[in-house]
From Swiss-Prot:
Record's comment on post-translational modification: Predicted to be exported by the Tat system. The position of the signal peptide cleavage has not been experimentally proven.
Organism (species): Ideonella dechloratans
Protein name, per record: Chlorate reductase subunit alpha
GO molecular function, one term: 4 iron, 4 sulfur cluster binding
Sites where the protein binds [4Fe-4S] cluster: 69, 73, 77, 111
Enzyme Commission number(s) from the entry: 1.97.1.1
Length: 914
């Protein structure tokens, strides 16, 4: 029964409702849409409707600017950014790229990570103002401080460290993919005499094996050149997932008649678009490549004339000691950089032109007809050719002999070799996976040998590794300080020492197993590292300096590196002030002492150069930096100003730096950084780079900031000119103009007679050991960390829309068969572990994986894992001694080119339900 109160309440509600309806009917401004009005002109006479106008205004903008996205991505894509009330609201691809004749256009460029950037930039993990740690490192307890407080503390610590400990104890790792942003740290490193690590080796992305063959190793065609190929090998490359802006060129090439081949341990998404899938066992790719070379040579599927001119395969090698026959063998004052070939016309050994020591800087042979094959004698010295040595050492690697190692049936190898032999334009898309295996060094040499044997290198084909970047003289000048070279080191070696990774690897790997497979163990790797440093082959700064002050710019150092927790703890005990500059609180920032807020991509004024397209792209700064953020250039300018101010106040001027024949001028470091006021602002810095680069020049700044992109001129190519009417392809001038390569022999060099290469049996490209994963066999799974679809490294890994397109948390992937054997179901939380560490993740069934493989897509942050673990907490690494070699012509320490690569895909693990 209803109570009186309930009855009265209902009656009052009805009364008020009736009154409200009556009032609305009487008011001309309320419920106007319900009135019946005569409409004579349907286009003009409809009443104005306020509620509809809300939607109209939602799609109006105060301004539209241009930008690209750079953090870890090599693509280069132009976007419009729509701004309202000073806030970037959304972005849209710019589809105005010009089309080359006969080539599909690049419109539009972009991916889903770029499309959500404006949304992601507003999330709470993006930094608004300077922060200082108030708890223990890693506790994530902060207080807000002013820029002046932050810069003063950093400046004083830099000065104190340099004065008390000596120059070279400042460490500045960086890897932001934008010209001015990156160069800001480079310039500061030079002025402080600081240590700068090779960030490419830190991530395991060097192509050191290929660097022994050509210089530079890291080169690509512009990706529209894929369309011109008729055979494309995607070797541990998954462009459908990782090259979203460019994958259409593969599909268009296929429609144009090209064959696509996917070579991978897993049946990845690119495999379904392939004409042939080659399932190679993890860590055995060099054996597969050797089998292909074996078939090509045995069937004489090679271009002899090309090999005679473009390669060192006809060069003579002594049979007594395995060394090149050199001019110094016959003359007391002869060069050790001048070599011989056997001239079949003259019937004798003659000097080959084009080498480093040759006066004739050309590959033109003139009347010389070098012998590719044969055994000869000259002046009492028995010699043979490099090609003969190669044939002899590659003979055992037949498709039948390698099947047990690679898991690839001989018929598949022969089918693929046949396609290679008959194709007109071979393209090898060389992914980042192989280089992270011990097998990767020799495999790189073998891959480029395949391309070279059929005469496609620098002609109709290419082996595309990673982008080389365009030649911008202005950028080089901005990053150079006369008389102040700074200190460059291998990131792997720096972390091997400071992070005590040597001990971690020694504890993890089975020494007896390594000695059986490789002939040496971790102790020998360490002794060879020390020997290399003592010989001056590799820089030794990590052995004589400490990272007392670390300023990390745009790189997630611990999460990026092997042995996360081991590196972190040992590095931080050496580091007294850890500064992180980034636009968000990533895993590395958790352990910072001071965090400086860098500008978002929408807040930058900068340019992006990447040679996968013929364009420079703009960060057009659609909005000014919000809150208290600053661009990286402005942060370094402000730091330089504060150092100079504090030095003058403390009466400190110059500190000599005799180790690098330089000095640090603290009292004028701001003047030096800004070139006495020429490059104070971001715009001044960008204009300086563009105006002083031949491939761009005056006027291009306005063009790139208006359109979002600008085409580079012919001189931008580092290995040849950029044509106006067709895609760029590297190393063409070596074929067309007979220009020597930057190698010791001046040619594509497939023989290295360095003592260490001889000792390790690696003079020619061939497998370095029996193949397979080198991790302890007591753990049944090999762990790989492929690039992800829903993030670019850690970029966008926390973005809400990207998380909704996947499991929303870190996962590991296993084959259903392996899961069943472990009693694990899809969606279970599992523990992945070995002697080095553990991490937890949700398991996801992936039938495309081999039963012994475990995938953990990289880029996840530590704080996204259960118990604050991380996938790199189980990894350990090895050093390939071949990558420690130096003092041999072109084979020497080169940042971004040649130094020890991160080899950590030899890690094995086990899995159990958590």
């Amino acid at each position: 029964m209803n109570s009186p109160d309930e009855h009265n309440g209902r009656r009052r509600f009805l009364q008020f409702s009736a009154a409200a309806l009556a009032s609305a009917a009487a008011s001309p401004s309320l419920w106007a849409f319900s009135k019946i009005q005569p409409i004579e002109d349907p286009l003009k006479d409809y009443p104005y409707r306020d509620w509809e106008d809300l939607y109209r205004k939602e799609w109006t903008w105060d301004s539209v600017g241009v930008m690209t996205h750079s953090n870890g991505c090599v693509a280069g894509c132009a976007w419009n950014v729509f701004v309202k009330n000073g806030i970037p609201m959304r972005e849209e691809q710019i589809s105005k790229y010009p089309q080359l004749p006969g080539i599909p256009d690049m419109n539009p460029r972009g991916c889903q990570k770029g499309a959500v950037y404006c949304s992601w930039s507003k999330q709470p993990d993006h930094i608004k103002w300077p922060l200082k740690r108030v708890g223990e490192r890693g506790e994530r307890k902060w207080k807000r401080i002013s820029w002046d407080e932050a810069l003063t503390e950093i400046a004083d610590k830099i000065i104190d460290t340099t004065v008390k400990r000596g120059p070279g104890n400042i460490y500045i790792p960086k890897r932001p993919f934008a010209v001015i942003t990156n160069t800001a740290y480079t310039r500061m490193t030079k002025l402080l005499g600081a240590i700068s690590p090779d960030a490419t080796s830190m991530t395991g992305d060097l192509y050191t094996g290929i660097q022994t063959v050509r210089v530079p190793a890291s080169t690509v065609s512009t990706f529209d050149d894929w369309f011109t190929s008729d055979l494309i090998l995607m070797w541990h490359k998954n462009p459908i997932v990782t090259r979203i802006p460019d994958a259409h060129f593969l599909m268009e090439a296929r429609y144009n008649g090209a064959r696509l081949v996917n070579i991978s341990a897993d049946y990845n998404p690119s495999s379904i678009h392939s004409d042939l899938f080659v399932p190679v066992t993890s860590g055995t790719d060099s054996h597969l490549a050797a089998a292909l070379v074996n078939v090509l040579i045995a069937g004489k599927h090679y271009k002899a004339d090309y090999l005679k001119e473009q390669t060192a395969l006809p060069f003579l090698v002594r049979t007594d000691n395995g060394k090149f026959l050199r001019e110094k063998d016959f003359k007391a004052d002869g060069s050790d950089q001048v070599f011989y070939v056997w001239d079949t016309k003259a019937g004798k050994a003659v000097l080959a032109p084009g080498s480093m020591g040759s006066k004739d800087k050309t590959l033109k042979l003139g009347t010389i007809d070098p012998a590719l094959e044969g055994n000869f004698e000259t002046h009492g010295i028995k010699v043979t050719t490099v090609f003969e040595r190669l044939k002899a050492e590659i003979t055992p690697y037949t498709p039948e002999a390698t099947q047990a190692t690679t898991g690839v049936h001989p018929s598949v190898v022969r089918q693929l070799a046949g396609w290679i032999a008959e194709c007109k334009a071979l393209r090898i898309l060389d992914g980042y996976n192989n280089q992270k295996h011990f097998d990767g060094f020799q495999c790189g040499r073998l891959k480029i040998l395949i391309l070279t044997l059929i005469g496609h290198h620098g002609t109709t084909g290419s082996i595309d590794t990673t982008f080389e970047g365009w030649r911008l003289e202005g950028n080089s000048e901005l990053g150079t300080v006369k008389g102040k070279p700074g200190r460059s080191v291998s990131a792997v070696l720096a972390q091997w020492v400071w992070g005590e990774q040597y001990q971690r690897s020694k504890d993890y790997f089975n020494d007896a197993q390594l000695r059986e497979e490789l002939g040496f163990g971790v102790d020998e790797m360490e002794s060879m590292r020390k020997e290399s440093e003592a010989n001056g082959w590799m820089p030794n700064w990590q052995s004589i300096k400490e990272p007392v002050v670390s300023i990390t710019g745009g790189i997630n150092m611990f999460a990026t590196s092997n042995g996360y927790q081991h590196l972190r703890d040992n590095f931080l005990k050496r580091c007294e002030l850890n500064v992180v500059v980034d636009f968000r609180l990533n895993s590395g920032a958790m352990y910072a002492d001071i965090v400086l807020p860098a500008a978002e991509n929408t807040e930058k004024l900068d340019i992006r150069e990447t040679s996968v397209t013929r364009f420079i792209h703009a960060f057009g700064q659609p909005v000014k930096p919000m809150y208290e953020r600053k661009t990286d250039w402005q942060i370094m300018v402000a730091l330089a100003a504060k150092i100079q101010e504090r030095a003058k106040a403390r009466g400190i001027a110059r500190v000599d730096d005799p180790e690098i024949k330089s000095g640090i001028d603290f009292d004028k470091i701001y003047d030096e950084f800004t070139m006495n006021g020429k490059v104070v602002t971001d715009e001044q810095a960008v204009r300086f780079v563009m105006d002083n680069s031949k491939a761009l020049g005056p006027g291009t700044y306005e063009e790139v900031m208006k359109n979002g992109f600008v085409a580079v001129g012919p001189s931008a190519g580092k290995t040849g000119p950029v044509p106006k009417d067709k895609p760029y392809r590297p190393f063409t001038v070596n074929v067309t103009d007979k220009k020597p390569y930057g190698t010791l022999t001046g040619r594509l060099q497939f023989y290295v007679d360095h003592d260490w290469f001889q000792r390790l049996g690696a003079t020619v490209p061939k497998p370095q050991y029996r193949g397979g994963v080198l991790g302890p066999k007591k753990y049944p799974f090999v762990r790989n960390s492929p690039h992800a679809r829903w993030g670019v490294h850690s970029f966008a890994r926390t973005e809400q829309w990207m998380l909704r397109h996947q499991r929303g948390e870190p996962d590991v992937r296993m084959s259903p068969k392996a899961m069943a054997a472990k009693g694990i179901k899809d969606g279970d939380m599992v523990r992945i572990f070995n002697d080095s560490g553990e991490f937890f993740a949700v398991v996801k069934a992936m039938p495309a994986l081999p039963d012994n493989m475990l995938f953990t897509e990289h880029g996840w942050e530590q704080y996204q894992y259960k118990n604050m673990t991380h996938y790199n907490m189980v990894s350990s690494e090895l050093i390939n001694p071949l990558e420690l070699v130096g003092g041999y012509g072109h084979i020497k320490y080169t940042s971004g080119g040649f130094n020890p690569n991160r080899i950590f895909y030899e890690t094995t693990v086990d899995v159990e339900k958590a």
